[in-house]
Amino acid sequence: MTLWRIRATVDDRPGFLSVLTASLALRKVNILSVQVHTTETGAVDDFLVEAPEHLTRADLVDAVQRGRGRDPWVSPADVRGLVDEPTRVLALAAKVLDGTATLEEAIAALLGDCDISWRAGATTKSSAVAAAGFTATGMQLPDPAGGTLYVRRPAPAFTPAEYARAQALVEVAKVGARHTAS
């Protein structure tokens, strides 16, 4: 068996997720975990699955599309994906606070395969608010140390939940910086 991460948008209506999961089950794909990210265009379902060795990325994309999933993204995964998401995020926050990880390292671990760059800028509250925001492929986050962090990822598209998690890590880093300065 092979581990895969699958992300797809499904209409947020009764029964639509079950159609997708049935399509995967027909191919002997076992769903190990699922996260649901609510968006304006539907529910973005993020699965960690175990699939028979012979199934390819294309086979899984086909299964998702036949199950009424849209915008499928499929990538190989490993056992680290089995860690409970809230536990993983709390561990990242602890690393930021105790200094064993930088904010950039924690955000990269949180969001997966992404590029993070930093640009100098003012650090007033209004500039920090102006620096915040996200699109499908990018995020802007105020760096508590000053400037702005730019996060880019071509796929899968960022969700509001991922943006909120990244913002929460920024807030944790702010608290850590205040305590360090004290």
Which stretches of residues belong to each language-model region?
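Regulatory loop-to-helix N-cap segments in sensory/regulatory domains
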Residues: 152-164
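A conserved regulatory-domain signal marking ACT and ACT-like small-molecule sensing domains
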Residues: 1-95
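Signal-transmission/dimerization alpha-helices at domain junctions
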Residues: 165, 169-182
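Short hydrophobic beta-strand micro-motif common in sensory/regulatory domains
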Residues: 133-147
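Helix-loop-beta substructure at the N-terminus of cytosolic sensory domains
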Residues: 27-30, 96-124
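Short amphipathic alpha-helical segments
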Residues: 12, 16, 56, 99-103, ...
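Conserved beta-strand segments of the P-loop GTPase G domain that flank and frequently precede/overlap
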Residues: 119, 151-152
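Positively charged, low-complexity terminal tracts
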Residues: 1, 120-134
